[in-house]
């Protein structure tokens, strides 16, 4: 997932949890007292402390001594955002498609794409993933401003 923080000046800081190194991920586990699987779940649930930890890990690339206990993100409730990345959307849709084909069901694909539209970092990634799977008829044509 990508965690983004919008600064007061409007600039957006993005950190991909998937791009963290093993040591960075371990540091996040340590400060949160959670396993990586638990952290991923917390991110899916939009837990602000987990999102703060991902931004903290990204910032530690420039400031290795940055202390998590005092690391704050003003107005985090309004300025933090989390969403699936394209590769995650591809993985989810592929798994749902395979399951749907095995069971001759279309409903699960519809539900999955609705969930992904609400959870994707970039909504256009859902349409692109559907197109790539040959399910372009499920793609919504949205203006780029809705991304």
Q: Across the structure, where does each feature detected by a protein language model lie?
A:
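Charged interaction scaffolds used for protein-protein
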Residues: 1-14, 19-56, 60-147
């Amino acid at each position: 997932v990508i965690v983004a923080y919008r600064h007061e000046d409007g600039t957006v800081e993005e950190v991909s949890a998937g791009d963290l190194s093993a040591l960075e991920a371990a540091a996040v586990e340590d400060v949160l007292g959670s396993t990586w699987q638990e952290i991923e779940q917390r991110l899916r649930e939009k837990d602000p402390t987990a999102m703060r930890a991902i931004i903290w890990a990204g910032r530690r690339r420039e400031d290795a001594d940055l202390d998590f206990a005092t690391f704050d993100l003003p107005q985090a409730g309004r300025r933090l955002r989390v969403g699936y990345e394209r590769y995650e959307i591809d993985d989810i849709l592929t798994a749902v498609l395979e399951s749907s084909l095995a069971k001759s069901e279309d409903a699960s694909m519809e539900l999955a794409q609705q969930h992904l539209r609400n959870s994707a970092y970039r909504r256009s990634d859902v349409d692109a993933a559907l197109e790539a799977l040959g399910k372009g008829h499920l793609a919504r044509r949205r203006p780029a401003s809705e991304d």
